[in-house]
């Protein structure tokens, strides 16, 4: 009986090792895209401040923030801002990612942005257009549209534009692309969307 139990335990251990070895013959991973079904974002609001108050509040805020003013025209109520950030996760959401490298055993589990930041040398750039319009002497309307560009490089150690990929989307929007050489076990696409953090920073100011 003891010999039988010993043989059974050994068989289980060997089987377990065989499974582990099989799993590590290639890089494997998993990707979960962000939720793109949330369509509650509105790109315009009406405030109880008049035009001058709203304009001054917005300009003062952006002058002391991460935004850079590209163009400013009070007569037309238009502001064009730009921004880029090493903390892309504040402004966009690209889902969650994990992998195990068979050669080194290295593992990663976290946001796709954290992975792309170091693994794909990702860069976020955005341009925001703000339009402030007078409704009457006591209220105004502010509309915001932002164009996001999130660029990744799939060639490490050298530059090859053919291996660069870019996500382009607007406020409240998203883009899904087929990525170059998706890791085994993951879906072939990646999705990035706006978190509306930048837009809400303006909207919350004038509410």
Please give the residue ranges for each predicted region:
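Ser/Thr-rich, low-complexity intrinsically disordered terminal regions
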Residues: 18-207
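Sec-dependent bacterial lipoprotein signal peptides
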Residues: 1-17
């Amino acid at each position: 009986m003891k010999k039988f139990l010993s043989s059974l335990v050994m068989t289980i251990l060997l089987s377990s090792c065989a499974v582990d070895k099989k799993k590590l013959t290639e890089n494997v991973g998993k990707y979960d895209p962000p939720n793109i079904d949330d369509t509650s974002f509105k790109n315009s609001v009406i405030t109880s401040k008049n035009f001058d108050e709203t304009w001054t509040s917005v300009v003062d805020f952006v002058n002391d923030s991460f935004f850079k003013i590209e163009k400013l025209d009070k007569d037309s109520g238009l502001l064009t801002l730009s921004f880029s950030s090493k903390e892309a996760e504040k402004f966009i959401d690209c889902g969650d990612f994990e992998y195990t490298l068979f050669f080194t055993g290295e593992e990663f589990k976290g946001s796709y942005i954290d992975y792309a930041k170091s693994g794909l040398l990702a860069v976020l750039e955005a341009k925001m257009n703000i339009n402030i319009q007078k409704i009457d002497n006591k209220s105004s309307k502010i509309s915001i549209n932002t164009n996001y560009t999130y660029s990744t490089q799939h060639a490490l150690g050298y530059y090859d534009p053919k291996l660069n990929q870019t996500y382009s989307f607007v406020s409240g929007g998203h883009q899904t692309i087929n990525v170059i050489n998706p890791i085994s076990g993951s879906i072939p696409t990646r999705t990035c969307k706006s978190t509306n953090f930048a837009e809400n920073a303006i909207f919350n100011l004038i509410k």
